Amino acid sequence: GLMAPTAMTINKEVVWRDNLYYLGVVVFLLVALALPFFSVPVENPEPNTQYWGMMVALLFIALYVIYVFLLHHSYKASLKNNQDSDVQESEEDDAEEEELEISSEPQAWGWIIGMMLLMGGASHVLVEAAIHLGDLAGIDAVIMGFVVIAAGTSVPDTVLSVISAKKGQYDAAISNVFGSNIFDICICLSFPILIALAMGGGPTPIVLPQIELIGSLIAATLVAFYFFRSGYELSKPESIILLGIYFLIVILSFTF
């Protein structure tokens, strides 16, 4: 919001689809962490620990599949609504298509796969360094993950959102923020569980984090929804407030 040339005007569908769906995913995460129903029975369980198995992983994947279906439905509806676009928009679309055809498909896939491998390797180094730093400083691994690792791995998402905001593509900027976080929770939690089960490792132990951190995510999402819902735009003062809430959560996380 701070990088946008004007107040960010947001489509109603983005607010009601992406924002609320992310809120629902975070609430489900909190429920899954809090209720023993989602924990797989094991012998000699560790205290304050949940054990997640196939059921939780499939539920998270199902949530993401539903979200992708909603995105696909919105995309098809958008195409139908844009069939009667004027000549100027058609010319702009043609120019964009010509620009995309500059690179061949194999070259594009090469860049995508290469960047994914690069970011994956960089993320691995970031995680190991952050955990080591937390051990040296006596900071809980959950806090390091919530603050340092989350911020570091979100840099690409932030760059994409900033670029979209500068271009006036506000819906894309907001959807990228919520969509990436939905992916992180639904897929990045479920796939390691499935991989561990496939390798015969049994249920994945989840040491219950500070519930206050999850609660802070819900509170921040509700504030964002209130701002987006009020006139369906995000002003610079509101952006400053959201940024302040983030720094407040970071500071408070060290006291939980």
Say what each PLM segment does.
Residues 1-256:
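Hydrophobic alpha-helical segments, chiefly the membrane-spanning helices
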